[in-house]
Amino acid sequence: MTIHQLINERVQAALAAAGAPDAPAVVQPASKPEFGDYQANGVMGAAKALKTNPRALAEKVVAALDLAGIADKVEIAGPGFINIHLAPEYLARRSEAALKDDKLGIAPVKPLRVMVEYSSPNLAKEMHVGHLRSSIIGDALARVMEYVGHDVVRANHVGDWGTQFGMLVAYLVETRHAGDADLQLSDLETFYRNAKIRFDESEDFANTARDYVVKLQGGDEEVLKLWRQFVDVSLKHCEDVYEKLNVGLKREHVRGESSYNDDLPVIVQELREKGLLTEDDGAQVVFLDEFRTQEDKPMGVIVQKKDGGFIYTTTDIGAVRYRHRELKLDRVIYVVDARQSQHFAQMFTICRKAGFAPEAMKLEHVGFGVMMGDDGKPFKTRSGGTVKLIELLNEAEERAYALVSEKNPDLSDAQKREIANAVGIGAVKYADLSKNRMSDYIFNWDTMLAFEGNTAPYLQYAYTRVQSVFRKAEDYDANARIVITEPAEKQLAAALAQFEDTLNSVVEGCYPHYLSLYLYQIATLFSRFYEACPILKSEGEVRASRLQLAALTAKTLRTGLDLLGIKVLESM
């Protein structure tokens, strides 16, 4: 049980003893050190409900509150807020236990089978900056959920089916490139652009492309051979991007739209049998009372077009059906642009009505905002084109390399490259993961690569700073007792004890920025501790204790940054 959970439980019991059994404790970390380590603010609401004086109720709660061995001071502030000051000895023992534990003292959870669907690019084209947020937010969530003990299934629901592949096949056959064995992704992109022009301008070409889609769906071996080549070339590119980005998606996590192709007619038939389908202008539509048009009529969701074709909503329904029936998932998280919120809400509703997803299986759309340029518009090249993700990451490394070369010109080129990779890629990722995912944010190289403020370089440097202490300390005792006497020691220890609460918040709300802000707080508090409490210049038990706090700080920073998918360095 975390300190927060423990205090919440004890305050809840005290509220019940004081005559307010249904009142929430509302315990949270103190906003300022002078308010203690935790504040319990539930008395105000309880007093209002009971129509009694909040200060008098607070006195009853404090009298009934049992925090022996946990807090050394509990006081009432203002009209009825309860400030709780943790006992230094209690924090010291918690810190020692966390340091000795591989998981930093995190209690095992009841494991759920959780799928995180993220990245999911359309194939036959290069990944662009629009894929960055889904890839890194989803990866951070998967890492955190796995770390706390859930059974995580990563899913890369790539767009590997549909008209664009018919267009590509038609163009390659027409231009006699269909037998090329060494197709590159850049070739496919060029071919696709040309194929799109032909598709829009020539009815004959468009019909041929559609015929190839039908052949593809029908399992024509020659067309399938070309399709597999397109998919393989595309996925190799994606894997290169994921490796550079330090994202944990592999080939085995790919289950694309094509995987559900054979299920789609069955799904439409099952929807029909359940009385959910209506034919509208030749199309098969599910009308949902829960969603209304501007004319206040039920909104329709097409699942089969009048030409017999299916759309991505049908595929997504098929994926939910498969994930429940075959994978037995407890929770499915879709990390997709916030602008798709209505699509997911409608798709989830259809799945519930059809019985494809029981209420016990949690379906969540984890949306996110847009990455903007300095002009406040979606991030583009200077010419207004789409920025390729690999080019953005390469630029991040080159900018970081220039910074490292300027700060440490004596390092070898290999050392500079290693640092540039960790700092450059880390900077791009952290600039995103440190923001509330629902917010749009401005992409700015200078801000994200700064070694001051809430940035990856600052946190990476904070970690190396702690490690430098241990390189100088020749007599570190990993079993030394922690003794907390100074305010800076206590503030650092109290914050380090909130690691589990922070991860629980990330798991519950799917907000990685909670972890980012926590790590920045730890780095800031360590800096204050380092200045106020000399480590190497102190002696005996004090020195040994402070080295232990430094070790726990390093372990927490390293673990936290790894959960965000950001590399640390032993020196910079």
Curated annotation (Swiss-Prot):
The keyword Aminoacyl-tRNA synthetase applies. SUPFAM superfamilies: Anticodon-binding domain of a subclass of class I aminoacyl-tRNA synthetases (SSF47323), Arginyl-tRNA synthetase (ArgRS), N-terminal 'additional' domain (SSF55190), Nucleotidylyl transferase (SSF52374). It is found in: Cytoplasm. Pfam families: Arg_tRNA_synt_N, DALR_1, tRNA-synt_1d. One of its GO terms (biological process) is arginyl-tRNA aminoacylation. Keywords: Aminoacyl-tRNA synthetase, ATP-binding, Cytoplasm, Ligase, Nucleotide-binding, Protein biosynthesis. GO terms for molecular function: arginine-tRNA ligase activity; ATP binding. It is an enzyme of class 6 (ligase). One of its GO terms (cellular component) is cytoplasm. It catalyses: tRNA(Arg) + L-arginine + ATP = L-arginyl-tRNA(Arg) + AMP + diphosphate. A motif ('HIGH' region) lies at residues 121-131. Its EC number is 6.1.1.19. HAMAP family: Arg_tRNA_synth (MF_00123). PANTHER family: ARGININE--TRNA LIGASE, CYTOPLASMIC, ARGINYL-TRNA SYNTHETASE. Monomer. Belongs to the class-I aminoacyl-tRNA synthetase family. This is Arginine--tRNA ligase. It comes from Chromobacterium violaceum (strain ATCC 12472 / DSM 30191 / JCM 1249 / CCUG 213 / NBRC 12614 / NCIMB 9131 / NCTC 9757 / MK). The lineage of its organism: Bacteria, Pseudomonadati, Pseudomonadota, Betaproteobacteria, Neisseriales. The gene is argS.
